[in-house]
A protein has these predicted regions:
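Short beta-strand segments
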Residues: 8, 68-72, 112, 136-142, ...
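A short acidic/small-residue loop/turn micro-motif
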Residues: 32-35, 90, 161-163
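Active-site nucleophile and cofactor-binding loops and adjacent substrate-binding regions
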Residues: 87-90, 110-116, 136-139, 285-291
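Short, acidic/small-residue loops that bind anionic groups at enzyme active sites
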Residues: 92-100, 165, 169
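Glycine-rich phosphate-binding loop of actin/hexokinase-like ATP-binding domains
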Residues: 129-188
Length: 309
């Protein structure tokens, strides 16, 4: 059975795993990429972490079939290079991820956007198995997205497609986004948008955990904030349903475990907002793979791209 190195590069940490051809994670580790305030370039940290991980697992690089990388940012998947970001990640734009990993390990490498990989991981061994038309959305610091249409990942001309967070839902009167535009969906639908609104009401509501705990306790202010937040998420998703006509929408990110307070309201609101024919058969639920989705999806992207299965 073939084995692969899956790498998931985030803004604060890199996750690494040995993944087999059935999508099982056999071993994994995680290292900070921000440990020194990014004075060490992220790619340098990733290369060292990958070497240390394989050594710790006693896995020689030559025993692997290849390396699949999931990476935050706008990823030119054709070249395996970081084409852009919307945050402050020093020395990251232009990072030649594919070339440096191939040089270091003498293995074939593919690189794709992290939200695209999350969606592919779910299609391979998660909650989207057997589906051909899927929208995957991750809610966190921003909003990531991956789109599967007709069984194929929608990547666009350079592999940059699927930047759902920068779909402009408030283009005329919206707040400034880190990308330089106004009114991007993620400024209203990201978990950080909920936290910003909650902090204005009560400084103790500092993260998703404290906010949802207050909601579980029946706090009316928090429940109103959640209602407004899920409205924003649902309105963005409704527009995408009309464009892509998916069978399934998967919602990922740490908050996606909140079935009653998040997933159920979003599902009801999306179905109420779209035309009846689009709501028929539409499923909306939480993603299943959680923290492993990126590395698993990265390996699936590698297999689809390099092995043409």
């Amino acid at each position: 059975m073939k084995h692969y190195l899956g790498i998931d590069i985030g803004g604060t940490a890199v996750k690494l795993g040995i993944v087999d051809e059935a999508g099982r994670v056999l071993a994994k580790a995680e290292e900070s990429v921000s440990f020194d305030g990014y004075r060490t370039p992220i790619l340098t940290t990733v290369l060292k972490a990958a070497q240390a991980f394989l050594a710790a697992q006693s896995v020689p690089a030559e025993s692997l079939a290849g390396i699949g990388v999931s990476a935050t940012g706008q990823i030119d998947s054709r070249k395996g290079v970081v084409a852009g970001t919307c945050g402050n990640l020093p020395n990251y734009i232009g990072a030649p991820i594919k070339a440096e990993l191939e040089k270091t390990f003498c293995l074939p490498v593919t690189v794709a956007n992290d939200a695209n990989c999350m969606t592919l991981g779910e299609v391979w061994v998660g909650g989207a198995q057997g589906y051909t038309d899927v929208i995957g959305v991750t809610l966190g610091t921003g909003v990531g997205g991956g789109i599967l249409t007709g069984g194929r990942l929608l990547e666009g001309a350079r592999g940059l497609g699927g930047e759902l967070g920068h779909y402009r839902t408030h283009a005329l009167d919206g707040v400034d986004c880190t990308c330089g535009a106004k009114g991007c969906w993620e400024r209203y639908a990201a978990t950080t948008a909920l936290v910003r609104a909650a902090q204005e009401e009560n400084p103790a509501w500092k993260d998703g955990r404290t906010i949802f705990a207050a909601a579980e306790a029946g706090d009316k202010t928090v429940l109103a904030l959640l209602d407004a937040w899920t409205d924003e998420i649902a309105q963005g998703l409704a527009g995408m349903v009309h464009i892509f006509n998916p069978q399934l929408i998967l919602i990922g990110g740490g908050v996606s475990a909140q079935q009653k307070l998040l997933i159920d309201p979003i599902a009801a609101k999306v179905k109420a907002a779209v035309m009846p024919a689009f709501a028929e058969g539409l499923e909306i639920r939480a993603a299943q793979l959680h923290n492993d989705a990126g590395m698993v999806g990265a390996v699936y992207y590698f297999r689809q791209t390099m092995e043409k299965e």
